[in-house]
């Protein structure tokens, strides 16, 4: 009787391996979906980091004190070098002009 009860609770190594693989696969999908959702909610996050880095760099401070045409102008209160800051209904504001 005890051998029947013990055999019911034993699991084959294949089933354990499949459960671990499934868990790791689902974990990867969850992390990837969080990344994609974050990128969708905050588009251009990498551009912002590059812009902040350039603004702090003393060599580029004069060159990057204003936004060039077609660059974003609504971040960090950056003014346009030439032209004006245009904000469409959807999307980021950008510098427009010569």
UniProtKB/Swiss-Prot annotation:
Q: Which residues form the propeptide?
A: 41-64
Tell me what this protein is called.
Hainantoxin-XVII.3
How is this protein annotated for GO cellular component?
Answer: extracellular region
**Where does the secretion signal sit in this chain?**
1-40
Subcellular location per UniProt equals: Secreted
Per the record, the coiled-coil ranges are none
- In which tissues has expression of this protein been reported? Expressed by the venom gland.
Keywords attached to this Swiss-Prot or TrEMBL record, sorted alphabetically, are: Disulfide bond, Ion channel impairing toxin, Knottin, Potassium channel impairing toxin, Secreted, Signal, Toxin, Voltage-gated potassium channel impairing toxin
What does UniProt say about this protein's domains? The presence of a 'disulfide through disulfide knot' structurally defines this protein as a knottin.
Disulfide bond sites: 66-81, 73-85, 80-95
Role of this protein: Inhibits with low potency Kv1.2/KCNA2 and Kv1.3/KCNA3 voltage-gated potassium channels.
- Give the family per the record: Belongs to the hainantoxin family. 17 subfamily.
What organism does this protein naturally occur in? Cyriopagopus hainanus (Chinese bird spider)
Molecular function (Gene Ontology), one example: potassium channel regulator activity
């Amino acid at each position: 009787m005890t051998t029947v009860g013990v055999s019911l609770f034993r699991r084959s190594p294949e089933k354990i391996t499949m459960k671990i693989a499934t868990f790791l696969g689902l974990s990867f999908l969850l992390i990837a979906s969080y990344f994609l959702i974050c990128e969708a909610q905050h588009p251009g996050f990498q551009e912002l980091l590059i812009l902040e880095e350039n603004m702090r760099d003393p060599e580029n401070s004069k060159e990057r004190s204003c936004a060039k045409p077609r660059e974003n102008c609504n971040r960090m209160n950056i003014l346009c070098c030439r032209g004006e800051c245009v904000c469409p209904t959807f999307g980021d504001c950008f510098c427009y002009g010569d």
